[in-house]
Amino acid sequence: MNGDEDWLTVGKVVAAQGMQGELRINPSSDFPERFTLPGQRWLKERNGEPRPIELLTGRQLPGRSLYVVKFAGVNNRNAAEALVGQKLLVPSSDRPSLAEGEFHLLDLVGLEARLQAEGPAIGHVIDLTTAGNDLLEIELLTGRRVLVPFVEAIVPEVQLNQGWLRLTPPPGLLEL
């Protein structure tokens, strides 16, 4: 597995936690088991190659979207801090199967954003933020970036095969 298409980014190491080598992970996956079930994962620096690492334990922080994980061989705060900023990966083949009409949130990145199904693009989805509600970061054709809540009332239609999604934003949302 060499190309980026062989890997799924499921989170990012955002901080060290405590003195025993635990790490805080900001998830980009809707599947908690990616952070809680022991087993092999991979870490990747910005321009580096993925390298295997063993997940020993993981738990979600109460009331937060962050996870705290413990990897084999990361036994102190200095070792943990050296991993901050790296992406947590799994092989693309580990992608869970979905029911009809469902999709993986990461598949939304790159889609055109439209106001009407047959209308022109107003921008593209460039990123996804997992918070209380998932937020799509859309870069408008003007170059400005806006955050759009990924809820059915605002994003009522997603056409993955055709490469677009439709927005029905409340007044002012795209002007923020």
Curated annotation (Swiss-Prot):
One of its GO terms (cellular component) is ribosome. It is found in: Cytoplasm. GO terms for biological process: ribosomal small subunit biogenesis; rRNA processing. Keywords: Chaperone, Cytoplasm, Ribosome biogenesis, rRNA processing. It holds the Pfam family RimM. Residues 100-173 form the PRC barrel domain. GO terms for molecular function: ribosome binding. InterPro entries: PRC_barrel-like_sf, PRC_RimM, RimM, RimM_N, RimM_N_sf, Transl_B-barrel_sf. It comes from the Bacteria. Disulfide bonds: none annotated. Binds ribosomal protein uS19. The PRC barrel domain binds ribosomal protein uS19. NCBIfam families: 16S_RimM. An accessory protein needed during the final step in the assembly of 30S ribosomal subunit, possibly for assembly of the head region. Essential for efficient processing of 16S rRNA. May be needed both before and after RbfA during the maturation of 16S rRNA. It has affinity for free ribosomal 30S subunits but not for 70S ribosomes. Belongs to the RimM family. This is Ribosome maturation factor RimM. The gene is rimM.
